[in-house]
Amino acid sequence: MQAYQRDFIRFAIERGVLRFGEFTLKSGRTSPYFFNAGLFDSGLALARLGRFYAEAVIDSGIDFDVLFGPAYKGIPLAATTAVALAEQHRRDLPWCFNRKEAKDHGEGGTLVGAPLSGRVLIIDDVITAGTAIREVMQIIDAQGARAAGVLIALNRQERGKGELSAIQEVERDFGMPVVSIVSLEQVLEYLAGDAELKKHLPAVEAYRAQYGI
């Protein structure tokens, strides 16, 4: 695990974004942990989050021309990542996002920001079922651009209804990488090394054994 990944997990726990206990997911599964990126809900937290995304962008080595934030949660994530890449890494890159509803006045259309062209890096919080990413792929295709990859905050490394995770299905169906700031594997490593949080390790390991990929 890299230093920025360890720092991100600590930050997520401090913000209450990553919590341990008993949580019922949309899938109906009872999970021993929960990740809610909506709780990065202050200016300072969002700025710091952007720096973690930017580190993961650099670490991934993915070549791309524009950042894209899917409405709605991806919009501030793409914005803060673009700021951090410019300020911390001297990479001033264009970014854009979509509206859920088309406008028929002003600039019109469903896209806002830089032109959606060339190689597109999609920025989002998590991939649960992959439905949102499939919708984004239609938007990208319609603009004649192509997806270079997807960057999310956490990879749960968890099977869907079949043998693959939603992330693996996206990678297979679209032939592009999905990378994350951290994965469940790194969360387990963090728990194992933290005296106070180690008590949650058996439950998370058992969940991984049952649903993991």
Curated annotation (Swiss-Prot):
5-phospho-alpha-D-ribose 1-diphosphate binds at residues 26, 72-73, 99-100, 103, 105, 124-132. It catalyses: orotidine 5'-phosphate + diphosphate = orotate + 5-phospho-alpha-D-ribose 1-diphosphate. Its EC number is 2.4.2.10. InterPro entries: OPRT (IPR023031), Or_phspho_trans_dom (IPR004467), PRibTrfase_dom (IPR000836), PRTase-like (IPR029057). One of its GO terms (biological process) is 'de novo' pyrimidine nucleobase biosynthetic process. It is an enzyme of class 2 (transferase). GO terms for cellular component: cytoplasm. NCBIfam families: pyrE. Homodimer. Belongs to the purine/pyrimidine phosphoribosyltransferase family. PyrE subfamily. This is Orotate phosphoribosyltransferase. The lineage of its organism: Bacteria, Pseudomonadati, Pseudomonadota, Gammaproteobacteria, Pseudomonadales.
